[in-house]
Amino acid sequence: MSRRHAAEKREITPDAKFHDYVVAKFMNCLMLDGKKSAAEAIVYGALDKIQAKTGQDPLKVFHEALDNVKPALEVRSRRVGGATYQVPVEVRSDRRQALAIRWLIDYSRKRSETTMIDRLSGELLDAANNRGAAVKKREDTHRMAEANKAFSHYRW
């Protein structure tokens, strides 16, 4: 990692259908091997499926799912005098969003439905209703931070 200057953030363009930056970021994270059109088809297909199932605005459900998965605290390893402590720290807002997106994608890929559209829509619906593997991951992260609260004075 270079110590000269931090890498500058790239501007991302909002997605074509919803004109939403977060949906565009989600697509970029879902994309494999530069196949953006495939990622778009999966995300839009999943959001259409959510609308068909619930009758609600799919963008609202998507943002609700993302908010339910965003972690507030996480633990970072800190070495103090030969011992390594798991120190709970607050998560920055940009990292919070990145972790939520990553967890939603990872756990939707691990689901058992046949198509990625079904898996992603299922995980988004579960997350919007505060259940599912991605929400469990957030709860586990918070539980780890709570268990190591005694070491919070080692914060940096």
Curated annotation (Swiss-Prot):
In its UniProt record, a GO molecular function of this protein is: tRNA binding
Q: Which domain of life is it from?
A: Bacteria
- Supply the alphabetized keyword list: Ribonucleoprotein, Ribosomal protein, RNA-binding, rRNA-binding, tRNA-binding
- Keyword Lipid metabolism recorded: no
The UniProt entry, under HAMAP family, shows:
Ribosomal_uS7_B
Give the matching NCBIfam families: rpsG_bact
In the record, the note on similarity to other proteins reads: Belongs to the universal ribosomal protein uS7 family.
What is the annotated quaternary arrangement, including any partners? Part of the 30S ribosomal subunit. Contacts proteins S9 and S11.
Record's protein name: Small ribosomal subunit protein uS7
